[in-house]
Amino acid sequence: MSTAIDVNPLLYASDTSSSLYDAARSFLEGVAAGPELVYLFWPTAMAYVRIATHPSIFGHPLTSREAVGNLTSLLALPHVRSPGEPSDFWATFSIVANEVAPRGNLVPDAHIVALMRANGVSGIWTHDRDYFKFDGINVLNPFAVS
């Protein structure tokens, strides 16, 4: 099963003041070790750079160079994919939108779900419970204690 990574594990791994910092770093080290196919969609990457460098969100925000460098390292791994929207993407997004009727902060999640469907990805590593609203998505919490 291929999976996608949502923005929050990336953010927790970059925020040393977070109680989830160590768990997020450990999770990303596991992702980096491979060999499972992992998707990092462009909206997730852009959200990471936007939030990780924002001084009102992070007490010690990353520089743009640091944030971009973190993603560059992740994207350089042979088992990490970053496809964009296919030419028929709007049809896929429309189906997702008709199922969930996203508004506000749920719109970016619907975008990610549509990208997942377009690329045959069924699972997402996230700490965001909103993904449970989408049918057919296996929500995987990287911080769940097993």
Task: Give, region by region, the residue ranges found by the protein language model.
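Short beta-strand segments at enzyme active-site cores
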Residues: 39-43, 126-127
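Short, well-structured N-terminal submotif of metal-dependent ribonuclease cores
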Residues: 1-40, 55-69, 146
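Acidic active-site catalytic centers that drive phospho-/nucleotidyl reactions
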Residues: 6, 109, 128
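Structured helix-beta-strand junction loops
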Residues: 34-35, 77, 134
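Conserved alpha-helical segments that form or flank metal/cofactor-binding pockets of metalloenzymes
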Residues: 51
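Active-site neighborhoods of divalent-metal-dependent phosphate/nucleic-acid chemistry enzymes
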Residues: 61, 80-123
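Acidic, PIN/NYN-like endoribonuclease modules and their adjacent C-terminal/linker elements
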Residues: 2, 113-114, 118-146
